[in-house]
Amino acid sequence: MARARQEGSSPEPVEGLARDGPRPFPLGRLVPSAVSCGLCEPGLAAAPAAPTLLPAAYLCAPTAPPAVTAALGGSRWPGGPRSRPRGPRPDGPQPSLSLAEQHLESPVPSAPGALAGGPTQAAPGVRGEEEQWAREIGAQLRRMADDLNAQYERRRQEEQQRHRPSPWRVLYNLIMGLLPLPRGHRAPEMEPN
């Protein structure tokens, strides 16, 4: 590298380093068990029944990608209408995408030669499942954030009401502050010269 800087030429391309700019992480180069659940790969151990990161009340996504659960005969949206993601609907007009969703729309290199510099496309169907999975997790996180914000606001209002003095106490403090109190046998305010 130092020799290349001295000669003025660029160093040889190293696999794994971006040349033009940052690229999305190639999920296909990971071990398949890190990308897919146990139901997708026949030789892998089964995935746990529910992800341990989210509380059970917020789970709306099935434990496997939607296409896998649909193939196994399970319902696509278990849990009723509350569990549906708040993302764009496939039959309605598509709103403008946020920055995170635009990043999801970018092609994800999944072929082994993806870092060599050539443009690659993900296998058909895989990208859609990953996007759907990401949208469902995003909807869960938004619901959790909304619930936490509502709970925080409720607690803040309760604390305000609990610490607010009664109107009688305010009146008493006002009257006692305006009345001159007898000094008694205490030391005078000003010491004599």
Curated annotation (Swiss-Prot):
Annotated GO CC locations: cytosol; mitochondrial outer membrane; mitochondrion
A biological process from GO: positive regulation of IRE1-mediated unfolded protein response
Region listing for Disordered, in residue ranges: 1-28, 71-138
Keyword Phosphoprotein: yes
Induction description: Up-regulated by TP53. Up-regulated by DNA damage, glucocorticoid treatment and growth factor deprivation. Up-regulated by ER stress in a DDIT3/CHOP-dependent manner.
Alphabetical list of InterPro entries matching this protein: Bbc3 (IPR031661)
Family: Belongs to the Bcl-2 family.
Keyword Hydrolase: no
Residues that bear Phosphoserine: S10
Localization: Mitochondrion
Protein name, per record: Bcl-2-binding component 3, isoforms 1/2
